[in-house]
Amino acid sequence: MSQPFRSADIRQAFIDFFISKQHTPVASSSLIPHNDPTLLFTNAGMNQFKETFLGMEPRDYTRAVTSQKCVRAGGKHNDLDNVGYTARHHTFFEMLGNFSFGDYFKQAGIGYIWEFLTSDEWLAIDKNRLYVTIYETDDEAFDIWHKDIGIPSERIIRIGDNKGAPYASDNFWTMGDTGPCGPCTEVFYDHGADIEGGLPGTPEEDGDRYIEIWNCVFMQFNRQKDGSMLPLPAPSVDTGMGLERISAIMQGVHGNYEIDLFVHLMDAAAEILEIENQQQSSLKVIADHIRAVSFLIADGVTPSNEGRGYVLRRIIRRAVRHGNKLGADSEFFYKMVAPLVAEMGTAYPELKDKQSVIENAIQKEETQFAKTLAQGLRLLASELEGLKDGDTLSGEAAFKLYDTYGFPVDLTADITRERGIVIDEAEFDEHMQAQRERARDAGKFDVDYSSVIQVENPTTFIGYEQLEEEGVTIDALYQDGNPADSLTEGMEGVIVLDRTPFYAEGGGQVGELGEIRTASGVFEVQDTKKSGQAIIHYGVVTMGDISTKQTADAQVLSSIRAASAKNHSATHLLHAALREVLGDAVTQKGSLVSSEVLRFDFSYDKPVSTAEITRIERLVNEQIQANTPARIENMSIDEAMKQGAMALFGEKYGSDVRVLTMGTGSIIDGQRKPFSIELCGGLHVKRTGDIGVLKITSESGIAAGIRRIEAVTGMNAIKNIQQSEQQLSELASQLKVKRPEVAQRVRTMADKQRELEKQLERLEQKIASAQAANLLDDVQTIAGTPVLISTLSGIDGKSIRTLMDDIKSKLPDSVIVLIGDKDEQLALAASVAKSVTAKVKAGDIIRHLASELGGKGGGKPDYAQGGAPKAANTNAVVNALPAWIADQLG
C-alpha cells in the first residue's frame, strides 16, 4: 500500500482486499439496531448479521466485508466517561470486519488476517511486532499460526478461562447463555519497549505497549442449556478491527487522537474556538463527540430525556461544557459538522445528505443548554467550595444539577474528577428513584413470544392477492411460548402454518385478524407476527381442538384488511405531502397502521401550523381524488434507489425489494415524477381513490424534534367530519352566533377572561399587602431570632413571593415562613436572613415542611419555595414548626 496511510485509504484498502477474496461489500447498518432490544446502539460489526449467524435470516452471499459505524455510550457498553482521558477510548468508532457464513473457517480466516497486515501489497506491518492470542485448547489455531504462518511459538499466547467459569475467557466468545459460540484469536501490535505494559495474560497487560488490533471469532459450537457444546453444522467466522487503532499504527503514532482524522477535527475545533494550545484534552472530547453526535442524528436519533435521545443529549452537553472550559461563550459545536463532513462524508454520504439537519439539531440543543449552563456551573462551584482532592460531593447537589440545570450526572462527574472529587452516587440514586421507576414502567412491553419461538421451516406468505387459503398445514403449535401437540377450547396459543394469507406486523402495519378452521376446531386469530422466516398467528381456540399436522383453512377478516390497506396507502401519501410542504429534512421516525386509524411520526423541530396542516391534507386528498393506480413492482434494491424510492425508518431490506408507486408529482428534468415512491412490503389499495378521503385529526409533539400526525380515512373520516360539524353547530347555538362567527366570538371571550384574571391578580396582591401589615403582630422570638410563621388563605405561589418581599423589608434579620392556602393547595415559602443561615437554611425548612405534608420543594439557604396538597395534618405540621426551628437554632 502506498504512502500516505490516511484513515480513508486504510478503510478502502480493507474493503478492496476482501473484495479480491470474493467477499460481498455490505454497507454499514444504522446505529439504531434493527429488532434487537438487547442493544442501545450498534456496537460491533456482527450486529447486523446476528440473525444470519443464528440461521434465521439467510443471505444471498456467504462472505461479507463491512466498515461498521459503532457507538459505545450508555448502557452496558459505555466509554463516555473515559473519552478525553485515555489514548484509545471513543464514543464513536469504525469497526472493519470480514465474515464467513458457513464458508471458510480457521485456515483461510487466519491467512487473510496475516496477508492483509504483513504483505507488501497491503499494510506491510513488521511481522516481528505482531503477537497473537488463542484460546487455551485451540490447538488447530496454534498450528495454523505456528506451522503455516510461521509465527514463533513464544509469540503465540494461550489464554484460558480467566473469568471464573468454563468457557468464560477473553478468548472464547459467546452470543448468550445458549447458542452459537467459539474460540477467538486476537492479533496484538507491540508499540515498543519505551512504552509501559506487558503481554496479554500477564499482570501488566493493561499497559499501552501491546495493543489489540484484530479479533477473529470462530463460531464452531452451539452451547446447550446444560452447558454442553455441540459442533455447528456450518462453522462461521466473525472478525473486527478498529480503524482508529490500525490507523495509528500505519501513521507511526501511539494514540488514536494523533491520527489524521482526529488531528483535522481538533485543528478545526481550535480554529473555531480561537485557541492556540492544541494539546488539551477538551479538544479530544470535542473531536470525538462530534462524530458520535452527527452519526446518531443522521441515523434518526434526536436529543430527548429518555433512551437513545438522552444519551445523545449527554454527549452534546459534555462537548459543550468542554468548549465552555476552553473559552466558548456562544454556540460553537454545530460548526464542527462541516469539518466532519469534509473528512467522512465521502465514505458515509448520509452525513452530506443530513448536514443541515445535524447542524440545526446540535445548535438547538446548544442554545437550550446555554440557558442553564452558566447557572449550573456557578452552583457546582459553590458546592465544591471548601472540598479538596479525595472529598465527596453530595448526591443531593448532583441531583439538583440534573433536575434543575439539565446536567447529566456523568457531566457533573466529569467536572468533579478534574479536581479529584467523587460524587455520592448512592445518595444521587435515592433522589433519582422516582424517575427510575417511571422509566421502568415506560419500558414494559406486553408478552411477545415472537422472539423466543424458534421455527425451522419458513412460512410462505400468499396474502398479497388473496384473503383465504384452503388446505394449509399446521406446522407447529405453541402455548406460553412452549411447543404443544394440541390446543383445546378456551386455550390461548400460537399457530404456525406452512403458508398463510395473514399479513404479519411490519412496516408499521398491525398484524391481521381472522380464523383458522380444521375438521376438529376453530382458532380465532387475534394478531399475526414474524419470528425469523416464520409467520406466527396469536389467538384462542373458540371451538373444539386444534392439533399439529392437521390440514386447515385460513381466512383473513376482509373488512379489517380493506380498512388497513386504505390507511397504509394513505400513510405513504401523507409522508410525501409532509416532505413537499415542510421540506426534505422531514424523515419518518415511526408509524402505526390499523383498520381504525393511521399514525405517522416524523422529524421536525417545531409544531406544524394550521395552514400547513390544511395544505398537507389538501395535497393528499387531491391525490385520492385523482384515482390513479397504486403500482407495485419487485426489483433490486439498487434499481429502487435509482428510481428515487424512499426506505421506511427502522426496516431492513434484502437485495430484492417491493416498491409502491402512487400519484403524480412534479415535472423534474422533463419527466413527470410520481407523488410517492417507497419501499414497502405491506398491503395497499388498487387505486388511490379507494382510500375515499383523509382527515387529519391531530398533530402533536411526542419528543424533542419529533412530531406526530394522526388521521383517519374512508368512512371513519366521514364520521369525524360529521362529528366536527355537529360540535360546531352546537357551539354556535350556545354562543348565539352563526357558525362562521364562532371563532371570533371565542377570541373575544378569551380576551375578556384574560383581563378579568389580571384584575383578580391585582386584587389578590392588594389583599396580600393588607394581610402583611397585620402579620408583624405574630412575630415570636426563638433563640434570640425573630421568627414569623403564618398561614394565609386565598394566597397562591405567585402572590406569596410578593408578600414575602414586603415582609422581609420590615423584618430584616429574621426567619419567615409563609403558607398560602388556595384551592386545596398549599404554597410554601421560607426566607432566612444571611446572618442566620449558618444555623438554619430556608431550603431545609421547605424540605422539612414538604416532606411532612406530602409535597416537594427546595431552594437556596436564604430563600426557598415548595408546594403540597392540603391535608388533614396541615395545622398540626404548621403548629409543630416553631419547635423544629428552635432545634435548628440551638
Swiss-Prot record:
An example GO CC term for this entry is:
cytosol
Magnesium as a keyword of this entry, yes or no, is: no
EC number from the UniProt entry: 6.1.1.7
GO terms of molecular function? alanine-tRNA ligase activity; aminoacyl-tRNA deacylase activity; ATP binding; tRNA binding; zinc ion binding
**Required cofactor names:** Zn(2+)
Q: Which top-level group of life is the source organism from?
A: Bacteria
The main enzyme category here is ligase
Pfam families xrefs: DHHA1, tRNA-synt_2c, tRNA_SAD
Domain description = Consists of three domains; the N-terminal catalytic domain, the editing domain and the C-terminal C-Ala domain. The editing domain removes incorrectly charged amino acids, while the C-Ala domain, along with tRNA(Ala), serves as a bridge to cooperatively bring together the editing and aminoacylation centers thus stimulating deacylation of misacylated tRNAs.
The cross-references to PANTHER family, in alphabetical order and at most eight, read: ALANINE--TRNA LIGASE, CYTOPLASMIC, ALANYL-TRNA SYNTHETASE
Q: What is this protein called?
A: Alanine--tRNA ligase
- Protein species of origin: Psychrobacter cryohalolentis (strain ATCC BAA-1226 / DSM 17306 / VKM B-2378 / K5)
